[in-house]
Amino acid sequence: MAYRGQGQKVQKVMVQPINLIFRYLQNRSRISVWLYEQVNMRIEGCIIGFDEYMNLVLDDAEEVHMKTKNRKPLGRIMLKGDNITLLQSVSN
């Protein structure tokens, strides 16, 4: 526990992964998904649904090739949670 002057306690709150995903969904944030064992490609899109297995439904999804920066539109897709290594918010 951290302390802030004059005996005030500051408690750090742990953020559950499901809450962060839900925040991305609520804010319609555009996210970048790093893929498992595919370091040269990422998927970008807006989360419109997910489940307890971290399967994601992405809207306006694009396949992004990291070396060439080429983008391939995919539309609305369902990405299995097994393929996800990292989720990151990206600015448009």
From Swiss-Prot:
Q: Specify the Sm domain's residue ranges.
A: 18-92
**A GO cellular component annotation in the UniProt record:** U2-type spliceosomal complex
Which key words tag this protein in UniProt? Cytoplasm, mRNA processing, mRNA splicing, Nucleus, Ribonucleoprotein, RNA-binding, Spliceosome
| Keyword Ribonucleoprotein tagged | yes
The protein's matches in SUPFAM superfamilies, at most eight in alphabetical order, are given as:
Sm-like ribonucleoproteins
Bilayer-crossing regions: none
Q: Which GO terms describe its biological process?
A: mRNA splicing, via spliceosome; spliceosomal snRNP assembly
Write out the annotated subcellular location. Answer: Cytoplasm, Cytosol; Nucleus
Q: Which domain of life is it from?
A: Eukaryota
**Which Pfam families does the annotation name?**
LSM (PF01423)
Q: What is its main location?
A: cytoplasm
GO MF entries: RNA binding
Q: How is this protein organized at the quaternary level?
A: Core component of the spliceosomal U1, U2, U4 and U5 small nuclear ribonucleoproteins (snRNPs), the building blocks of the spliceosome. Most spliceosomal snRNPs contain a common set of Sm proteins, snrpb, snrpd1, snrpd2, snrpd3, snrpe, snrpf and snrpg that assemble in a heptameric protein ring on the Sm site of the small nuclear RNA to form the core snRNP. Component of the U1 snRNP. The U1 snRNP is composed of the U1 snRNA and the 7 core Sm proteins snrpb, snrpd1, snrpd2, snrpd3, snrpe, snrpf and snrpg, and at least three U1 snRNP-specific proteins snrnp70/u1-70k, snrpa/u1-a and snrpc/u1-c.
Please give the function described in this protein's UniProt entry: Plays a role in pre-mRNA splicing as a core component of the spliceosomal U1, U2, U4 and U5 small nuclear ribonucleoproteins (snRNPs), the building blocks of the spliceosome. Component of both the pre-catalytic spliceosome B complex and activated spliceosome C complexes. As a component of the minor spliceosome, involved in the splicing of U12-type introns in pre-mRNAs. As part of the U7 snRNP it is involved in histone 3'-end processing.
Report the family membership.
Answer: Belongs to the snRNP Sm proteins family.
Protein name as annotated: Small nuclear ribonucleoprotein E
What is the species of this protein?
Answer: Danio rerio
Give the gene that encodes this protein.
Answer: snrpe
